Every structure is written in C-alpha cells, then in structure tokens.
Design a protein with these regions (language model features):
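Signature aromatic-anchored transmembrane alpha helix within multi-pass, membrane-resident enzymes
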Residues: 29, 448, 454-485
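Transmembrane-lumen/periplasm boundary regions of multi-pass, lipid-linked membrane glycan transferases
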Residues: 55-70, 227-228, 235, 240-414, ...
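Short acidic/glycine- and proline-prone juxtamembrane loop motifs at membrane-interface regions
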Residues: 117, 138, 182-193, 236-238
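Transmembrane-helix motifs of polytopic, lipid-linked glycan transferases
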Residues: 119-160, 199
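Hydrophobic/aromatic-rich transmembrane helices and adjacent perimembrane loops
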Residues: 183-184, 190, 432-462
C-alpha cells in the first residue's frame, strides 16, 4: 500500500485525492515553519552549555584533526570508527553524531565548531517533528482506512478526520515540548536518536497495518523501518530496545488483551501479584529518601503488569497469532539489522584498540547506565513525563485517565502508541537510573496521545470549545517564546552557564601559559574545545576516565609539577568566603602546601550551575605558611 494512501486517510468521504494531498502539504508546511522557528534561530549565540554538548563537540573536533592527519586508509578508518578524546578511546556512544558534524563542517568548508553541532541537532529536531506527524498519521488514520470510527475520549467518535488532526496537533505539541525543544537546542545526541526511532516506529506501524489489511507487510514500511533502525543503532545503544518495544511489542500487547478460550487462568491471578511484591521488596533496598518508597511501589506495579502480559501470552491462542504477525512484519529482520550494526561497530572498535580495552570501556558504560529496580528511577521518569512535552504532557494525562476509566476497545494499530509510551517507560524505570534525556525518543508518543486528547476534547464540547485559531495561537506563542529564549534570552539571563566567555578571556590574557593550566575536581570539555588543549583535572572527579577525557592527577603530583615548573594555573570552583570555610577547595589546597594568588577575571562561569570558577596561580609554600592573597575573593 503506497504511503500516500495512509497520509490521505485523514479526510472526509467527500474529499478528492487532490484535496487530501493538498491538506497534507499544508500540514507539513505549517509544521516545517513552526519547527524551523523553534530550532534554528541563533544557533551559536550562546556558548557551549554543559558537559554533554562540550563532549560531543570536543570529540568531533579531535576526530576531524585525526582524519586530516591520516596517512593510510587504516588511519582514516580508525579515526572514523573509534571516537577519541585527548587520545583516549571514547566509545560510550556510537559515532553517528560525530560523523554528522564532520559532514556539516565539510559542507561549509571548515572544521567542526559549535554551530555545526547545533545545526545537526536542530535539523534533527525539525525532522523529528515531521516524523511525529508521519507516525501519527500511520498509527491513528491507518487504523481507520476502512472508514470505521473508534470510541475516543469522552464519548467522541474518532473518525478519519479527527485522527488526521490528532497527528497534526501531536506533532505541533512535540515541536513546542519543553524537554524536546531543550534537547534540540543544546547539542544532545538524543535528538538524533528520537528522529531515527520515531521514523522506525512509524514505519513498523505502517508495516503492521498493511499486513493486517492485505496479509502482506508493505515493502516500503519494512525497508524504512530497517534503515531507520540501523541509523538509530549508530546513534545510541538503547535504540534497538526502544524500537523493539515501541514498534513491535504493540503486537504482543494487542494479543495479550484478546479474550481467550476460557476465563482467567490461575497463573493470571497469582503470578502478577507475587512478581509485583518481589520486585517491590528488591527495590526497597535502594531507597535513600522517604519519597522513594512510592517509587518502589511503582516498580512493583510495573513488574506486576509485565508479568500479567507475559502470562497472558503463554496461551497458544494469543502467542501464535502474535508470533505470526511479528514474522509478517519482518520484525526479526529489522531488529536483527539494528543489533548487527551495533555488534559490527563494536567488533571494529575491538580490532582497532584491542579486545581488553574494548571490554573495559564497554563495562564502564554498562556500570554507569544499567541500574536494576532502583526506586527513584520511576519517580524521576514520571516527573520528566509531566514536563517533557509541555502542554502535550498534561493533555496526555487526560488521555491516560480516559484509557483507565473507560477501557475502550482500541484499534490494533493504536496499541503501537500504548507500547511506545508504556513499555519504554517500564524499561527505563526498571533498568535505568531515571535520567530524563533518555526518554527523549518517547516524547513524540506522549505528544501524539496529547494530540488525540485535544481533538477529542474540542469535538466533545462543541458549545464550549475554543476556536481552532486560539489553540493555534497558543502553540505559536510557545514556539516563539522558546525560540527567543534559546536564541537571545538564555544569554541575557544565564550567561554564566557557558564556558565561552571565560575561555575567550583566558586566551586573551597576556603572558598566560595555557599549557600549565589545571582544573580542581572538575572537567570541562567545553573549555577544552575553546582553548584547543586538554585541561588536566586535579583530584577526584566521580566519573570514569572516558568521561573526564583522561586520568586526573593527585595533589602530590600537582605539587611535583609546580616544583618542576615554578608555577601552575588552577581553575577552582570557589565562592565568596571560601577562604574562610574549613574544607572548601581553597582551604584544602592551602593545607596541601600551596600558595594561591587570585588572578582576577571578569567572565563568570559556573560549572554545572554551581560555584563560579576562579583562576589562581599556584606556587609551593611550607605547610604552615598562610595562603597568599587570601583576602581576595573570586567573582560572585
């Protein structure tokens, strides 16, 4: 079935194919303008923000330098396949984000800069909005190709026209969603993952719908799902899991809710509560705060729900049709290609850097991200879901309440949306530590549920409904407000959260030797990208070597270096009055035998939003000597 037929499903019976296509073009153009206004203005008006953005930029810059210096094909392959930071292999993430920056830089005839990173991510955000529209049209309207209306929110009959509008509003809501926009404006690679996963899940839904209607999955849908999954696997490791749960596990959920030959089995009555209780008890061991007890209860509930689905699928009359459908949509091929892509990349890395180092780096990444049944994780994820898509999140809450209250019989294709949200929330809550950006690929699904709720509410109360132009004006206001904030407002209100001004001031200081520059108990790849060299961290960092760009040195090692060179420059997180507070960084350095002389700077940089970074010149003093210029305070 051509994709145009799916996109055309949103019109009324009286519409001609030409009118349907024209409406789709209008929708796409409107969404394109909206997304471009949100994501593209003032890309590099604000400097590097946060560790994530600095690391993505620094690795791309060093990959570009290695590629330009390559002499042999092997050198070039090693530069492209094995990302490095300060000479150390950094394979925590696949290289797609770095390749994209290199392509953008080559297209402009330059080396990677902040503008290229933000352009790549912003374009992914724009395309992600359009991909959300595509997925919504397939999921909502595709289930209604036969013209059958479906019971929607508050008794509304969701016909093809309302399904079309739900996809439109869902895409508009994700394009103005708080955390989705944030990811698209600060250089996070999760935006590339969200784009790829949304395309893959939409294509998987298209394949399933055509298989159900025609008995054969669309080749275009299968190929699109496979290509998007391969691209997603080169963005970030959880890609195959996200696509598998969002794009294909909906088939399993749909099979699980089908009535069986008999009533509920004994296993259905006893296994889920036992699993829930056991999971809650395990999760309680991770409680660090009284509020985490509620998180442990949520962990138990999620595990119990998954156990119920698993028990239901044990019945052959449910499992066999589900297995047949999964084979029909070629889920094994799509997901297999994604897994193979990830495995082949890691094999290439292993051959280039050695199996031992590759295993060590993989182990560090797993240890850092895999957290099983942590009580705080679902609470963190719930909070992220409440704000992730802005107005779309709150509308989605009404949609969830409708599903719980009315328990409508959903079309088969709509279970893709349920799985996309529900199962991925379960996965990140039961196996992760509750980092909100990890849910970025789920924001389009939440926005689509919000869009469905919105059109249902407007249709359910025609006497009280707001005119469409008021809703549209609200969305446009959200778009323009966020566009202004990231293009201009952020620099006006929070200039200290970027390292750019401090880096430029350091570079302009006469006689400043940046080769003797160190940082105390923090690492900033953003600063390093601006200065063009590594800043050696001193002291504990609480992160692995790959994240810090190399090993830190101890105070004793710093003392030896100062003894050899006579002086060192140290960037220290230091607030006003730190020199008088026992245990502060200034106090600890003084007790270690250093004389600290403040080098005043006008630029203010707060690493991770904490204490401002002050520049000190270090020389050696006796352990009992006072700290020189201790009355001088760092910038507020």
């Amino acid at each position: 079935m051509p994709i145009g037929h799916v996109f055309a499903a949103g019109g009324s019976i009286a519409e001609t194919p030409v009118q349907r296509r024209a409406r789709t073009v209008r929708h796409v153009l409107a969404l394109l303008l909206l997304a471009a206004a949100v994501f593209l203005p003032g890309l590099d008006n604000y400097g590097v923000y946060g560790w994530q953005e600095g690391q993505r930029l620094l690795v791309a810059q060093q990959m570009d330098a290695r590629l330009r210096a390559s002499v042999t094909v092997r050198d070039a392959a090693e530069a492209l396949i094995v990302p490095r930071v300060n000479g150390l292999a950094y394979v925590a993430k696949p290289p797609m984000i770095y390749w994209a920056q290199l392509l953008a830089a080559r297209a402009t005839g330059s080396s990677p800069e902040l503008w290229h990173l933000r352009l790549v991510v912003a374009v992914s955000g724009v395309l992600g909005v359009l991909a959300t529209y595509f997925a919504g049209r397939v999921i909502f309207a595709g289930a209604l190709l036969a013209g059958n209306a479906v019971a929607g929110f508050d008794g509304v009959r969701v016909d093809a026209r309302l399904a079309d509008r739900a996809a439109l509003w869902g895409a508009a809501l994700v394009g103005t969603g708080t955390l989705f926009v944030r990811s698209g404006r600060i250089g996070e690679l999760d935006m590339l993952l969200a784009l790829s996963c949304t395309l893959a899940i939409g294509a998987a839904a298209w394949s399933w719908e055509t298989w159900r209607i025609a008995g054969r999955a669309s080749r275009g849908g299968v190929l699109m799902a496979a290509a998007s999954t391969v691209a997603a696997a080169l963005c970030k490791d959880p890609a195959v899991m996200i696509i598998g749960l969002g794009g294909y596990a909906g088939i399993l959920l749909y099979a699980a809710v089908q009535p069986g030959r008999g009533g509920p089995s004994r296993a259905e009555r006893f296994v889920p509560p036992l699993v829930a209780a056991a999971a809650m008890l395990v999760s309680l061991r991770t409680v660090e705060d009284p509020a985490d007890i509620a998180g442990a209860a949520i962990v138990g509930a999620l595990c119990g729900a998954l156990a119920w689905v698993a028990v239901r699928l044990c019945a052959p009359d449910r499992f066999v049709p589900a297995l047949r459908a999964l084979h029909g949509v070629r889920a094994w091929l799509v997901l297999g290609l994604g897994i193979a892509t990830s495995v082949l990349w890691r094999i290439g890395v292993s051959r280039l850097i050695g199996p031992a180092e590759a295993r060590s780096l993989l182990g560090q990444e797993i240890d850092d991200n895999l957290r099983v049944l942590v009580a705080s994780a679902p609470l963190n994820n719930l909070w992220a879901c409440l704000i992730g898509v802005g107005a779309g999140s709150w509308l989605a809450i009404f949609g969830v309440l409708w599903l719980v209250r009315d328990r409508p019989r959903l079309p088969a294709g709509w279970w893709t949306l349920v799985a996309w949200i529900g199962l991925n929330f379960c996965a990140f809550s039961l196996l992760g530590k509750g980092v909100n950006r990890y849910l970025t690929p789920v924001w389009p699904a939440i926005a689509l549920l919000g869009g469905l709720t919105l059109v249902s509410l407007l249709a359910a109360h025609p006497a009280r409904r707001m005119p469409a132009w008021i809703v549209a004006a609200t969305v446009v206001a959200l778009a323009l407000g966020q566009s202004w904030y990231y293009a201009a407002g952020r620099g006006r209100f929070y200039p200290e959260l970027s390292s750019r001004d401090l880096a430029l001031e350091l570079r302009a200081m006469p006689g400043l030797d940046t080769s003797a520059l160190y940082s105390f108990e923090f690492a900033s790849p953003g600063l390093e990208s601006y200065l063009g060299r590594r800043i050696v961290p001193v002291g504990g960092l609480r992160v692995n070597i790959g994240m810090s760009g190399g090993p830190a040195i101890t105070l004793d090692e710093l003392s030896q270096r100062v003894l050899d060179t006579g002086e060192a420059l140290l960037l220290v997180p230091a607030s006003i009055g730190d020199e008088l507070r026992p245990g502060s960084p200034i106090d600890r350095l003084a007790r270690a035998g250093f004389t600290l002389t403040l080098r005043p700077t006008t630029a203010v940089f707060r690493h991770s939003g904490k204490a401002p970074i002050a520049l000190y010149a270090l020389t050696l003093a006796g352990p009992s000597e006072p700290v020189n210029d201790r009355t001088a305070s760092p910038a507020p």
